[in-house]
């Protein structure tokens, strides 16, 4: 792949990504990188490119704020799915492996350091949060239904009692 093709590919990846995480991959073997790519598959792609080409692609997309992360052996994690699950996977891999270092991230147009990625990894997944919201909503709806139906059932009992007495 030529440098122009690499920049074009990076521009496409960066512009389509919901979030971007920067990692240092110094010391990781090819097998470890392959394992990391497999771990991230579906939610993100793990790209390694020359920092100069990544910087050019970032400028073309309009991301000028994360040049600080493009020093040393830097890989780009382009998040297509849930940022929380990607952050959890990266943290788990970094803890297990010990060589992967998270440099920072770019989420919703803002640049954050590695601590933000660690905090994202501590959040519950999107599915768990949605399940909790559904549970709370269901409980509130059940309570509201009980409040509405209680007077109606009381009135029905009064009518049945009146019918039985007359």
UniProtKB/Swiss-Prot annotation:
SUPFAM superfamilies: Ribosomal protein L10-like. Keywords: Ribonucleoprotein, Ribosomal protein, RNA-binding, rRNA-binding. InterPro entries: Ribosomal_uL10, Ribosomal_uL10-like_sf, Ribosomal_uL10_bac, Ribosomal_uL10_bac_type, Ribosomal_uL10_CS_bac. One of its GO terms (biological process) is translation. Coiled coil: none annotated. GO terms for cellular component: large ribosomal subunit. GO terms for molecular function: large ribosomal subunit rRNA binding; structural constituent of ribosome. Pfam families: Ribosomal_L10 (PF00466). It comes from the Bacteria. Belongs to the universal ribosomal protein uL10 family. Forms part of the ribosomal stalk, playing a central role in the interaction of the ribosome with GTP-bound translation factors. PANTHER family: 39S RIBOSOMAL PROTEIN L10, MITOCHONDRIAL (PTHR11560). Part of the ribosomal stalk of the 50S ribosomal subunit. The N-terminus interacts with L11 and the large rRNA to form the base of the stalk. The C-terminus forms an elongated spine to which L12 dimers bind in a sequential fashion forming a multimeric L10(L12)X complex. This is Large ribosomal subunit protein uL10. It comes from Tropheryma whipplei (strain Twist) (Whipple's bacillus).
């Amino acid at each position: 792949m030529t440098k122009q093709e690499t920049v074009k590919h990076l521009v496409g990846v960066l512009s389509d990504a919901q979030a971007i995480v920067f990692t240092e991959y110094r010391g990781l073997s090819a097998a470890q990188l392959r394992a990391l790519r497999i771990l991230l598959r579906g939610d993100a792609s793990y790209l390694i490119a020359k920092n100069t080409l990544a910087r050019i692609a970032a400028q073309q997309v309009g991301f000028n704020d994360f040049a600080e992360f493009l020093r040393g052996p830097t890989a780009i994690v382009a998040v297509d799915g849930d940022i929380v699950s990607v952050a959890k996977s990266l943290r788990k891999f970094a803890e297990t492996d010990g060589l992967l270092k998270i440099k920072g991230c770019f989420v919703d147009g803002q640049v954050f350091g590695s601590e933000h990625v660690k905090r994202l990894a501590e959040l519950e997944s999107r599915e768990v949060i949605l399940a909790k919201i559904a549970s709370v909503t269901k409980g509130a709806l059940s309570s509201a239904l009980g409040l509405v139906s209680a007077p109606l059932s009381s009135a029905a009992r009064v009518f049945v009692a009146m019918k039985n007495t007359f």
